[in-house]
Amino acid sequence: MKLNKKGLLIILSGPSGVGKATVRKALFEMTNHNFVYSVSATTRKPRPGEQDGKDYHFLTKEEFEKGIENNCFLEWAKFIDHYYGTPKKQIQDFLKQGKEVFLEIEVEGATHLRKKRMPNTVFIFLVPPKKKDLYDRLKKRGTEQEINIVQRIAKANNEFRLAHKYDYIVVNDEVANAADRIIAIIRAEHAKTKRSIRNYLKILEDNVYAE
């Protein structure tokens, strides 16, 4: 019997500099699971090594605002003078295919998604071992002016207070460890009764004594 398995929408969120992209990429390399990354859109400039359509859809302010008007985003937010958003259609297509869809989004965007109460959605809050690690990582990027780093740290202090609203909190002490924890979370989510009961009932329908 072929069992139906719906994909999960996995929201990986946390303060800027916590390592969301690094952990997600490591997770994808560690397993051949049915994972896909939903590429977000932004109006900020690409960082060194980032590719349009792979890391982000890099849009102009006018293009992004037109997308807002046309209801093209599942969620969107403005962060330090730049828009960030999640294109809606690609996520819907992936979930219909039974794929596990990963979103890396800002805390404000995750807050908007929680209010939508979407089914089969798991919210994971990624945190550093120490707050100072955020400053060190942002500084190491070399892409931010000091004033922007200070703004991001101030925003992060407020975002930490929202961690209790997430389904899971994962500490990014080591990238591989954080990725392992997220894989374990996904397996546990699929085993929950509310997601597996229909397939279990289908198994019970089989007559194992049939000749």
From Swiss-Prot:
Keyword Cell wall biogenesis/degradation: no
Nucleotide-binding as UniProt keyword: yes
Protein name: Guanylate kinase
Any one GO molecular-function label of the UniProt entry: guanylate kinase activity
Primary role: Essential for recycling GMP and indirectly, cGMP.
UniProt keyword annotations, A-Z: ATP-binding, Cytoplasm, Kinase, Nucleotide-binding, Transferase
Catalytic activity: GMP + ATP = GDP + ADP
EC number assigned by the record: 2.7.4.8
Domain (Guanylate kinase-like): residue spans on this chain: 7-187
GO CC annotation terms, alphabetical: cytosol
PROSITE patterns per UniProt: GUANYLATE_KINASE_1 (PS00856), GUANYLATE_KINASE_2 (PS50052)
Pfam annotation, one family: Guanylate_kin
InterPro entries recorded: GK/Ca_channel_bsu, Guanylate_kin-like_dom, Guanylate_kinase, Guanylate_kinase_CS, P-loop_NTPase
Localization: Cytoplasm
Protein family per UniProt: Belongs to the guanylate kinase family.
Top EC category: transferase
Binding site for ATP: 14-21
